[in-house]
Amino acid sequence: MKKELEMELQLCQSLPGQQMSFIRGTDLFGYVGIEAVLDQMRRKTMKAGFEFNIMVVGQSGLGKSTLVNTLFKSKVSRKSCMPNYAEEISKTVRLHSVSHVIEEKGVKMKLTVIDTPGFGDQINNENCWEPIVKYVTEQYEKYLREELHVNRKKRIPDSRVHCCVYFLPATGHRLRPIDIEFMKRLGKIVSIVPVIAKADTLTIDERQEFKERIRQDLAANGIQVYPQKEYDEDPEEHLINDRIRESIPFAVVGTDKEHQVNGNKVLGRKTKWGIIEVENVAHCEFANLRDLLIRSHLQDLKDVTHNIHYETYRVRRLNESNWRLSPGPLENGARSGWNG
């Protein structure tokens, strides 16, 4: 009831000068059918499907492709198929993307995985994040141009990066300079979720100590990772996200191999000590990462991308002197006043 009153007050305040009256659901004379809008939205979404674009960044050998395949229980990584986008932006870092349509229980998702082979693999990794920053901002620019088109598409194709999963090697020490510099720069333009790769190489105590040191380094360097406190919309969401923030970075293990454990088939890695069950939270935090990216926060990642990161870029671009937004025809996909 308190929440309903707050919503009514907010609505009244958002419409100054207009008289508003409310009839609560309990005061209605009969069934109206307002809740049916949820079914309408569900049917529309199931028919159209939706897009989700995830970037994976980290040095070679950390199991990026394997983890992505494990997340979506299918061969969706760059190594599993030919890329539909490939660009060598520098001598060291290349970007590849592959797209798949995944369907589950009638819901279709166009999943695009952007990989960054070559990142952090050189002796001199100076400015190795620049090609990635360039790619992320190029997708914002592409979306912005489509928005400004006079005869724009009913549904603008969305290639913006909704999430960047950053892989940290399980050193057990602290963040490296390259980790700090990358997350400081990318955290301003995209939602970053850091993970400790191949966490089975650490003991449980080593893992917890490493996670704590990483959180200290993130705070000391002003690095913002998803989900950010400032974007929490209500107390309930704040409590949920606080638990996630206390668990970051997730210590993960990826595999596409199944093993028999107590008569059940489980995804896991076989070691001389036994089977490490990927989806067993007592063994690693893969399930927590999966729940965050897919089951609980996927739509929020898309919303933060559109309402925060893209909006910041859009406002900056429209305020730049080389934009003139006077009415006019579009030529070659750009407004006639575009000088960029």
Model-flagged regions — what are they?
Residues M1-Q139, N280, R290-I294, G337-W338:
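Conserved G1/Walker A P-loop phosphate-binding module
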Residues L28, F119-N125, V133-P177, V193-P194, ...:
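Conserved Switch II/interswitch segment of TRAFAC-class P-loop GTPases
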Residues M55-V56, T112-D115, H162-F167, P249-V252:
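Extended hydrophobic secondary-structure segments that form protein cores and membrane-embedded regions
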Residues Q59, T116, A170, K198, ...:
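Residues immediately flanking
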Residues L67-L71, C128-P131, Y135, F182-R185, ...:
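Alpha-helical scaffold elements adjacent to nucleotide-binding pockets in ATP/GTP-utilizing enzyme cores
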